C-alpha cells in the first residue's frame, strides 16, 4: 500500500458502495480527521424483497455493534486504533445479487465481509468468498449444506438449520403433558426450510412420535391453505412450520380460518420476531418457536455486557425488544472484531487464522468454531408466545416461564 496508515471499512450502504480512501485490492484504507483509520468490512443485506423484515433486524444488530465498538475507541489493530464504519448495500433478498455484491467489495479491496440474511444468500456469497480469498462471518445462514462443501473462509456464529425444528420437538417431548402422539411438518420449499424439516422429522421419529408426510409450499407465499387442507383430515397433534415470517403468520391465520386445530403449533424463525405477535395478536398465543438467542442466554463480553444489557440497548436504540436476528448479527460482528484484534491485522488470512482459534464468552453465549466453520458451543432455545411476549420455556435451566400445553384452546 502507498500509505502506512492502517485502514479498514465496514462497507454496507443502502444505495452505493462507499470505499474509504485508496489502496490495493488486498486492503481498503482511509484516515479520519483525528488521524485514526477505519476498518473495512463489506456486507450486503436484504433491505427490500421478501426477506426485508429479517434483513432490517440484521442491519440493526450490525449497527449496534459498530456503535458499541467505536464508543470504546474502536479496535486496536497492531497498536493502531481504527473505527468501524458500517455502510449498507441492498441485495434485494436475491442470492445472485448478494454474490455479485461480494465481488464488488473485492474489486474495491474489501476482503472482510459480514453476511447477508438467510441461507440462500449466504450460500451464494460463500462460494465467491472462497474464490476471492475473502473472509466472511455468517450471522444468519444456517443451512448445514453451506458447511458441507469444505469452505475454509466462512465462519458462522449461529446453530445449523437442523436444530431449529429439532429443538421444538425436544421441548415438546420433554415438557408437554399429555404428550402428543403425531406431528406433521409444513415447510417452505427453500433449502433452509427443507433442511429444518429433515432435522425435525429425524428427531421426532427418534422421540417416538408418529411423523406424517410433510407438506411443502412456495417460499415467501402468504397462502398455505392447500397444505393445511391436506393435513386437516389427518388430525395431527402438533403442526410445526419450517418457515420464515410471512409463511409463519399465514399458517396460524389460515389454520384458524380452515378449522385446523392441533393441540399445539411450533415454527422456526417467525415466532421470536416481534412482528409475529404484533400481526397475529391473540392468535399468536402459546405458539412455540425456536430461537438462536434469548435474553436469558448466559455470557458476557466487554462491548455488549450480558444478554439483559443487550436487550436494554436494542430497546433504547430501536424502540422494540430484540429478537435473535438482532443478536446473531451483533455476535457475528463481535467475532470479526475480536479476531482482527487477536490477529493484530486486517488481512483476511490473518483474521481467518484468528477466527479458527477464537474461544470466547459473549452476550450471545460461547463462540468457538469447528473445522467446518460452525460454532461448536451454540445450542438453541425454544420460546412460547405468552401474553404477547416471547418467553424462553426450554431448556428448563434457562426458562423464564413454564410451557403452556395444550397450546391451543
Where are these predicted regions, by residue range?
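Short, low-complexity disordered leader/linker segments with a strong preference
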Residues: 1-40, 77, 107, 408-409
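Extracytoplasmic "Venus flytrap"
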Residues: 32-65, 89-95, 117-120, 186-195, ...
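Extracytoplasmic ligand/sensor domains, especially the bilobed periplasmic-binding protein
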Residues: 96, 110-213, 263-289
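Extracellular/periplasmic periplasmic-binding protein-like sensory domains
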Residues: 255-330, 396-408
